[in-house]
Amino acid sequence: MFELNNFDAIQIGLASPEQIREWSRGEVKKPETINYRTLKPEKDGLFCERIFGPMKDWECHCGKYKRVRYKGIVCDRCGVEVTKAKVRRERMGHIELAAPVSHIWYFKGIPSRMGLLMDMSPRALEKVLYFASYIVIDPKETPLLKKQLLNEKEYREAIDKYGEDSFVAGMGAEAIQDLLGQIDLIAGSKELKEDLKQSTGQKRVRIIRRLEVVESFAKSGNNPKWMIINVIPVIPPDLRPMVQLDGGRFATSDLNDLYRRVINRNNRLKKLLDLGAPDIIVRNEKRMLQEAVDALIDNGRRGRPVTGPGNRPLKSLSDMLKGKQGRFRQNLLGKRVDYSGRSVIVVGPELKMYQCGLPKEMALELFKPFVMKKLVQDGIAHNIKSAKRMVERVLPQVWDVLEEVITDHPVLLNRAPTLHRLGIQAFQPVLVEGRAIKLHPLACTAYNADFDGDQMAVHVPLSVEAQAEARFLMLAAGNILKPSDGKPVCVPTQDMVLGSYYLTMDRTGAKGEGMTFSNKDEAVMAYESKYIDIHAQINVRVYKEIDGVLKSGIIKTTVGKLIFNESIPQDLGFVNREDEKEKFNLEIDFLVTKKSLGKVIDQSYMLHGPTKTSIMLDNIKALGYHYSSIGAVTVAASDMIVPPVKYDLLHEADETIDKIEKMYKRGFISEDERYERVIEKWTKTTEEVADALMDSLDKFNPIYMMADSGARGSKSQIKQLAGMRGLMASPSGKILELPIRASFREGLDVLEYFISTHGARKGNADTALKTADSGYLTRRLVDVCQDVIVREEDCGTDNGIYVSEIKEGSEVIEELRERLIGRYTAEDVVDPNSGEIIVARNEYMNPIIADKVVSAGIKKVKIRSAFTCNCKIGVCAKCYGMNMATAKKIDIGEAVGIIAAQSIGEPGTQLTMRTFHTGGVAGSDITQGLPRVEELFEARKPKGLAIVSEIHGNVRIEETKKKRAVFVMGADGDERSYDIPFGSRLKVSDGDYIEAGDEITEGSVNPHDIMNIKGVDGARRYLLSEVQKVYRLQGVDINDKHLEVVVKQMTRKVKILESGDTELLPGIMIDIFDFQEANDKVREFGGEEAKGEQSLLGITKAALATDSFLSAASFQETTRVLTEAAIKGKVDPLIGLKENVIIGKLIPAGTGMMKYKGLNLNTKNEKIEENETEIVE
């Protein structure tokens, strides 16, 4: 059975005139649209009902046939078929042109495809097409050359000289069409291949480009003549609608205006040709027709754009596809959906982790069809119509039915911007009064939501399958870990942290200290009866079952800790239960801060899984809120105590600065050095004041409690409140050497206040710019990785990459342990001391094994990696390793490319924007933060380039008055010299031994240089560690595997150098697996293999170089991508996610993969016979 949307690939090509006539339902002959009196379409016009179908369902133009019973009849009076009005969205028309015109995409694009094919410059081509010059089509016996251009005067002279019929020349698209028809593609291709062998330089480049176009036409079966249009298709009228406004005026789509100009000029040209008008008039009309068609296809590509009222350029067919408002991004990749609503969110602390509060009226509207069905089922309403009436009148019975319907029917909540997959989660709805959605406080972090007026959208999964997926994969209680680094995302914040902190504090000398109680309950009762303080150190006998025997012991603790531990599993490994002394101790016997809560949740998840953890989280939430209310922590001005030491420290700093000034005035130190020392001194003084402040604050000081617990605020903010504000940056980003000495408690004077406004404004400006930049980076990352899916279990490769800790100078940025957890080994890991195998090859490393490896003193390990995965598309489960979001091995069908892009893009907004200026010292002004990440992913030449050694060898530095030079002496006597520019800082010293690819001066390295020196692996390692450095310095953890996925996509292409006996053309980019395949084929027959080099593409280039033209066209440069794809007759294999979303199929990830296609749901609660069940892979 043929299903329309069950196809495997989609192909694009040039349309022949016959094809266009076949699509069409009739010719549009008149420029009229709608009759303004009758409001009915004009016959043969742009909205003609005979061509495009009826305006109203089952009704012809003249009104002879009305009603559905005449379905399919063509009216004998007006010729309109009686059918649904929806056909006006799919029926096309056409315009027969009186003279052929060229298609602007193929003539004007860069490079001009028409120009390359005919071997003419685009400028010459333009002269011919727009009737400025004649072109010689056939010189016959005359000495004229084929394709020679003649202006009017030369043409007349040639005719006088050689006679009327002695040669053929023409102008306009007709002449070009004749010439295109004469091209022999196969012979041309052979000839070009011969020329290629002899040519070099610029000429070779041109031949390669021409060869590419010629081969495209030859292989795709497109006829070059089809680049010239004889028939123009007219798109269906409902895609270019005309609507009546209130005042009786009409609003129309720009396309109608553009079509109207084409029809008018075409009809005028026909008339002129019939009259036999003079050549010059006809020629002018033909040129105008050509311009009208250009404007219709791509307005503004050549010359001035055609404008509508108010000088606004009209939107042409190309503009309909381009950009954010174009067809691809606006209607195909994201659509508005039914069964959705949005409202303001408020906090719902009483909810369970998997619940959300849904306003009653919203729920009724969202679940309307379900409620109606249930009303009929339960016999409350007799038919659907009366059920609908009941719902619309909101009768009391409806609410009970609604309650039943929404039990076990999860809804999806989404908050924009959705930066990572945790921005959409599923919840079990609970009906609430009011009109606000209630959100669980622990879900806020994932959504980055707060309750200052944020809004969220609700979506209802309709089908049983969708509900099942929402419940099992998207329920908020299951999404406890972050997919980017595997750390918990549901960590309690603010009040909850403060309450837990308050609960687990100790206070010496509190009421009831030293008392002893026979069990927990007695101690809690004593607290509730106000005999003891919640923070008092007491002794309590606790009972525990050990090996089936009930034993007891006395422990020293506080009531607060007893209460807190009731909701915590007592086996998380914070206490060594083997030790006799610690057998009965409480699991959480320390002061709880936000950090330690994170560790508790992490441990609980690893040991007990998501369900138990989410129950524990709800308990911590309840305790936290309750005890933060009881603790009643407030802030007053009296809590900010300025440390008395501050003034001594400031005095001492002033004296030091005076000394530095004196040294500078006497010429002992330079201006830069003076500046650096002053800054250093003030930084140190500020730190000292802050330390003195923190030491002087009482442990029960509310401000100290908030900061120490991690509930709100930080040391640097307290420093500003009661210490000193310290150094500020000027608008240029340079640090001012005058610090702000006052704190907010003391108050700033006018100058200090003014200086601090610079920073405030810069902060705001940066945030606004950063959001847009970060969003665009995410979009490019998604586009480059979207087709990376886990496709198989094991690709069987023997390769891997060596990993060791990443360092920035002497500081370790990422530890080896972190890089090993959740990965597979690529070779046996052997203990260097005992020689025993710690981990065998292809083994999975969990945290315990990773600790073993590190403690054995091993510094580098070879692991399986996405870099070396052998999958032709996507990656395999073993090369990828652990799924960070579940801490288990990854499943087949997981869309790891999208997850990688989101994990890198989501923290983008936390990165800094600005370059830090440490006072204009050269070499240290390197880009950081977001611009640096972008620079790396786009593989650009960085600012502040470092000089890199090309060979291994020893360093010799020579300084003369004029310059410094560094010589590297290789072992084989090879010597390279590098001139060091003034102001650069050296990273090497005399006599050092350096490797190829090591930096000689400070700065960033051009990744392409590393590619040339160290090869693909070196470049990949460099990119990975450099991006990691930027994120880690900002305190953002991202797992390596996400970066590996992206960097692999950047290095997938091979540039062909020599084609050998393959069909590959030199100079083109091709996927590395296709390259290997082509070479394998040639090798079988003993031919010469193609030679190529792996290239490094930036993410934008890599996204555009994908095999899928749909994905590339919907990303950027739509017209260019489609032009190229059409000429090549490209086939889109629909492998990635984007292509499938565009054509409206299920994405090939998760349950949308091919192997699940045949599964049918058993929804009828039938028992499946044991022997019938098939085990589904």
UniProtKB/Swiss-Prot annotation:
Cofactor details (free text): Binds 1 Mg(2+) ion per subunit. Binds 2 Zn(2+) ions per subunit.
Provide the E.C. number(s) assigned to this enzyme: 2.7.7.6
Q: Name the family.
A: Belongs to the RNA polymerase beta' chain family.
Q: Which reaction does it catalyse?
A: RNA(n) + a ribonucleoside 5'-triphosphate = RNA(n+1) + diphosphate
Annotated Zn(2+) 2 binding sites = 795, 869, 876, 879
NCBIfam families linked = rpoC_TIGR
Listed under subunit, the entry gives: The RNAP catalytic core consists of 2 alpha, 1 beta, 1 beta' and 1 omega subunit. When a sigma factor is associated with the core the holoenzyme is formed, which can initiate transcription.
| Gene Ontology biological process terms in this record | DNA-templated transcription
**Protein name, as recorded:** DNA-directed RNA polymerase subunit beta'
Any keyword Hydrolase? no
| Keyword Metal-binding tagged | yes
Question: Which residues are Zn(2+) 1-binding?
Answer: 60, 62, 75, 78
Annotated residues that bind Mg(2+) are located at 450, 452, 454
